[in-house]
Amino acid sequence: MALAAQQALEASGEQWTPLRASVFAALASFEAPASAYEVTEAVSSAQGRRVLANSVYRILDLFTAKNIVTRVESQNAFLVNAHPLHRHDCIFLVCENCGTTQHLDDDAAVEHVRAVAKTAGFAVDRPVIELHGRCHDCQAH
């Protein structure tokens, strides 16, 4: 995954620096969406020195703009994008009980949302679709 992220970033004219690689690795180590603060703590721990939160925020903003990570808006958290070389809109299933977040790729559903917005005279720049409920495991309990 890191190689695809590096290729996507470099294809956009940006450099894959050691700090950017560390931020990506830290974010990839989380099983659930991680906040910028959590990523900062993980990078600081891995490097054995305090990394400035502002640096991590800037890198996460760059990664979001370049499709390397996606942001779960309601959680103000980030996930590594498994397909950084292919831009697509995401649908997130967010469990209100345990916090797990599943990423779905359903271009037809998102295109339908875009079409409905266009019919209403609205130009969508970046759709953010999140469905909140309970995951399969939490439903079983």
What are these regions (language model features)?
Residues 1-24:
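Short alpha-helical segments that sit at the start of domains
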Residues 8, 25-30, 42:
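Short amphipathic alpha-helical elements of helix-turn-helix/winged-helix folds
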Residues 16-18, 30-35:
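Short capping segments at the starts of secondary-structure elements
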Residues 35-49:
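DNA-recognition alpha helix
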Residues 56-66:
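Basic amphipathic alpha-helical segments that dock to polyanions
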Residues 64-141:
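Non-DNA-binding regulatory cores of transcription-related proteins
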